[in-house]
Amino acid sequence: MELGIKGKRALITGGSRGIGFGVAQMLAQEGCHLHLAARSAADLDAARAKLVAAHHVDVTCHAVDLSDAANAAALARECTDVDFLINNAGAIPQGTLDTLDDTTWKRSWDLKVFGFIDITRELYARMRARRSGVIVNVIGAAGERPVASYIAGSMGNAALMAFTRALGAESPEFGVRVVGVNPGGTATDRAVKRLRERAEKELGNADRWQELLSKSPFGRMATIEELGALVTFLCSPLSGYTTGTIITVDGGACSRRA
């Protein structure tokens, strides 16, 4: 299937690892040139080397902390040519109302919630002015199915879902699309590391970590390639009538009855 996005340019925040890198791989496979933003210059350089070697596209790296609105504005000025913005940076820690302190809560929202808002504000204005562009917010399934043990993440993700729907309802007036993706459990390096640690503790062998997923849909987690493929399709003109909606990728977990 030809997606019709060869030569387009994309900015991916949190693009050096995990889901962000999965998105980068799939966009590069389609011939897109990339801007990758993340905090670690070393991780960015490693990601760039892999992408250039495999796909021969242009990859520009930006080592930046997007929890600071001024940094988001500066990044936007360096990426005025992008056709696609993929907001993916940030992770909100587990914790209940009683155990999660205000400092941790606010710091994580500065990156995951306000970080999305700040960079979107900058680039959405440019997309409106030229009447083209796609914004994909990679959010999280806890926004759809909130739990008290992940209260800050549930609330932050729900806020970003509302942000996506509101902006995506307005954006067609300006020739722009705004959509969201809610990943469930995804086999990132970080997630697998945690499962290996748990398997070592509970099963006595880290290599048995996949046994811990036996009750998950399909007995596994999503792959970063599956998430990347969806985001890439949403960026393409083949998904040109999709805006203001959220697609949940969790193997049906949010639709299950307890």
Regions found by a protein language model. Give the residues of each.
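Conserved glycine-rich cofactor-binding loop
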Residues: 9, 16-18
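Active-site helix of classical SDR
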Residues: 120, 156, 164
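Alpha-helical segment proximal to the catalytic Tyr-Lys
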Residues: 125, 169-170, 240
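Active-site loop-to-helix junction immediately N-terminal to the catalytic Tyr of the SDR YXXXK motif
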Residues: 100, 146-155, 166, 194
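Substrate-binding pocket helix/loop in short-chain dehydrogenase/reductase
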Residues: 96-97, 104-109, 212
